[in-house]
């Protein structure tokens, strides 16, 4: 009987959060271990369906770097990286589009739909669809400088690696009105029709800003942001994060991720969250419990 009461208390704990977030939009960046393990993939899909059923509008932006690497290897092509960014020539870009926009995207869509009961449906798109993501070639020198990585200029032509220039949210708004869950591959295009592979964290931030989302959530392979003593922070402000970058507490691959959080907040998103995607149902645990399971970031 005691365990039954505990379950009821857990459900009741979620009630005020459900009430507050009903009708709101959450943009979720899906990647890392959460995509690689079957049990975590299932838990993610269940979380997304749960959000939709209780009246929250989830929008998913996914990565797929490891999958791209696997297919390049199968085709006898070498993966080259500069500071964590994949050098993407025209041939590589074609494979990126095939893997991200096709194989990875549709597998996520299929999994979510398998849990939907037919009442709501996921639909897979890229930034090319509906002119969703207008992009431009990444200013690599500026990008690396922003994360404290000063590289020789001659090493900075990354090919078809892009950055978001503009988001046209009209398609996403229509999909939401028709009860669809958008699943977005981070590929954009420019005025000349060139395709670009874009960091999915920054795509999620830009889309969240364009939709004026309530939250943007990043599934990662860490517990959350850590302080100088290695303790996980349950919350942090932008000023604290900037100081942690300055002090070298936040470094390496975490810098672009927190900068994506900051971009989203500056574009009007209420809160950003860095979650441990290795934890099953991390989305529900972060959103619908008082304690949460990650780091909540605010202005």
Curated annotation (Swiss-Prot):
<dbReference type="GO" id="GO:0042450">
    <property type="term" value="P:arginine biosynthetic process via ornithine"/>
</dbReference>
<dbReference type="GO" id="GO:0005737">
    <property type="term" value="C:cytoplasm"/>
</dbReference>
<dbReference type="InterPro" id="IPR037528">
    <property type="entry name" value="ArgB"/>
</dbReference>
<comment type="similarity">
    <text>Belongs to the acetylglutamate kinase family. ArgB subfamily.</text>
</comment>
<comment type="function">
    <text>Catalyzes the ATP-dependent phosphorylation of N-acetyl-L-glutamate.</text>
</comment>
<comment type="pathway">
    <text>Amino-acid biosynthesis; L-arginine biosynthesis; N(2)-acetyl-L-ornithine from L-glutamate: step 2/4.</text>
</comment>
<keyword id="KW-0808">Transferase</keyword>
<protein>
    <recommendedName>
        <fullName>Acetylglutamate kinase</fullName>
        <ecNumber>2.7.2.8</ecNumber>
    </recommendedName>
</protein>
<keyword id="KW-0547">Nucleotide-binding</keyword>
<dbReference type="InterPro" id="IPR001048">
    <property type="entry name" value="Asp/Glu/Uridylate_kinase"/>
</dbReference>
<dbReference type="GO" id="GO:0003991">
    <property type="term" value="F:acetylglutamate kinase activity"/>
</dbReference>
<dbReference type="InterPro" id="IPR001057">
    <property type="entry name" value="Glu/AcGlu_kinase"/>
</dbReference>
<feature type="binding site">
    <location>
        <position position="197"/>
    </location>
    <ligand>
        <name>substrate</name>
    </ligand>
</feature>
<keyword id="KW-0055">Arginine biosynthesis</keyword>
<keyword id="KW-0963">Cytoplasm</keyword>
<keyword id="KW-0067">ATP-binding</keyword>
<feature type="site" description="Transition state stabilizer">
    <location>
        <position position="257"/>
    </location>
</feature>
<feature type="binding site">
    <location>
        <begin position="64"/>
        <end position="65"/>
    </location>
    <ligand>
        <name>substrate</name>
    </ligand>
</feature>
<dbReference type="InterPro" id="IPR036393">
    <property type="entry name" value="AceGlu_kinase-like_sf"/>
</dbReference>
<feature type="binding site">
    <location>
        <position position="86"/>
    </location>
    <ligand>
        <name>substrate</name>
    </ligand>
</feature>
<dbReference type="GO" id="GO:0005524">
    <property type="term" value="F:ATP binding"/>
</dbReference>
<dbReference type="InterPro" id="IPR041727">
    <property type="entry name" value="NAGK-C"/>
</dbReference>
<keyword id="KW-0028">Amino-acid biosynthesis</keyword>
<feature type="site" description="Transition state stabilizer">
    <location>
        <position position="29"/>
    </location>
</feature>
<dbReference type="InterPro" id="IPR004662">
    <property type="entry name" value="AcgluKinase_fam"/>
</dbReference>
<dbReference type="Pfam" id="PF00696">
    <property type="entry name" value="AA_kinase"/>
</dbReference>
<dbReference type="GO" id="GO:0006526">
    <property type="term" value="P:L-arginine biosynthetic process"/>
</dbReference>
<keyword id="KW-0418">Kinase</keyword>
């Amino acid at each position: 009987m005691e365990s039954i009461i505990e379950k009821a208390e857990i459900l009741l704990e979620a009630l005020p959060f459900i009430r507050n977030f009903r009708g709101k939009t959450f943009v979720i960046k899906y990647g890392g271990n959460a995509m690689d393990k079957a049990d975590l993939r299932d838990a993610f899909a269940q979380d997304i369906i749960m959000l939709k059923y209780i009246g929250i509008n989830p929008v998913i932006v996914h990565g797929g770097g490891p999958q791209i690497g696997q297919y390049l290897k199968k085709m006898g092509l070498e993966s080259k990286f500069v500071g964590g960014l994949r050098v993407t020539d025209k041939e590589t870009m074609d494979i990126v589009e095939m893997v991200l926009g096709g194989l990875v995207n549709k597998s996520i869509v299929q999994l979510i739909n398998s849990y939907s009961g037919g009442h709501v449906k996921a639909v897979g798109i890229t930034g090319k669809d509906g002119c969703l993501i207008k992009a431009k070639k990444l200013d690599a020198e500026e990008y690396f400088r922003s994360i404290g990585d000063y590289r020789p200029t001659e090493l900075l032509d990354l090919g078809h690696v892009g950055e978001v220039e503009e988001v046209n949210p009209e398609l996403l708004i229509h999909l939401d009105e028709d009860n669809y869950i958008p699943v977005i591959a981070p590929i954009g295009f420019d005025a000349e029709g060139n395709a670009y592979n874009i960091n999915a964290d920054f795509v999620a931030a830009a889309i969240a800003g364009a939709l004026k989302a309530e939250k943007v959530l990043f599934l990662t392979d860490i517990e959350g942001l850590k302080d100088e003593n290695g303790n996980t922070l349950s919350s942090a402000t932008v000023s604290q994060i900037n100081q942690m970058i300055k002090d070298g507490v936040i470094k390496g691959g975490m810098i672009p991720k927190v900068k994506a959080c900051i971009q989203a907040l500056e574009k009007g998103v209420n809160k950003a969250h860095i979650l441990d995607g290795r934890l099953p149902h991390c989305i529900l645990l972060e959103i619908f419990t008082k304690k949460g399971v990650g780091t909540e970031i605010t202005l």
